[in-house]
Amino acid sequence: MSRDGHLRPPRLGLLNYMLKALESDGAKDVVFIPVGINYDRVLEDRSLVRSLDPEAERRSTGFALKKTFGFIGHNLALMIRGRWFRFGYACVNFGAPVSARAWIEENDVSDEAARQKSVDALGRHLMHSVGRVVPVLPVSLIATVFARRGGEPISELDLKVAAHALQTELEEKKARIYVPHADTDYALSVGLRMLTLRHLIIEKDGLFTVGLDEMPVLQYYANAIAHYFEPLEGPE
């Protein structure tokens, strides 16, 4: 989980260490399993986004405890009144395994320069593999529509039309899209509801817009699938 929601670069130093170890006789193979995870709700999302601002005032332990107990109390009150909703969906996908030994056999690691080049290529390949299996969830889909529009007000109908078009674009890119109950309209409604309940999205006069100062948090969820629309280095 990154602080801004984006996929992060691989740790090449660790990969280099692994490949070096595999060059010794009798060393066991290392197999990488690409894992893509996404969440409709990350409990510490505001804290993660806030940590990116170097000028943000540091919060005290007392403030953190107050917010935690306030969060628990608020959700208990919603449960008692029958107005509590789940925090959305979490989804995980697995990609094709990548054998480090097979990678060594197929790539030149005869000297330090060649090994470093191979490590760089392996890192790109692994992150490409992870990116291809990151699931697209309702909140990320809706958040992306708002992020692309810069927070401009939009009706629910136009929002869903834009989200449908975005989903079609993602399907063409062979993205793993999770559609609860196999109902796209329901999925989009759930994503919108999640964001409005948290006041990240505000409804007024039949139009939805981004809440005051909430675009960074909304962008955090859009960033989870942003790599599908950017060039991914690695083999297809």
Regions found by a protein language model. Name each.
Residues 1-236:
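Membrane-interfacial terminal anchoring regions of lipid-handling membrane enzymes
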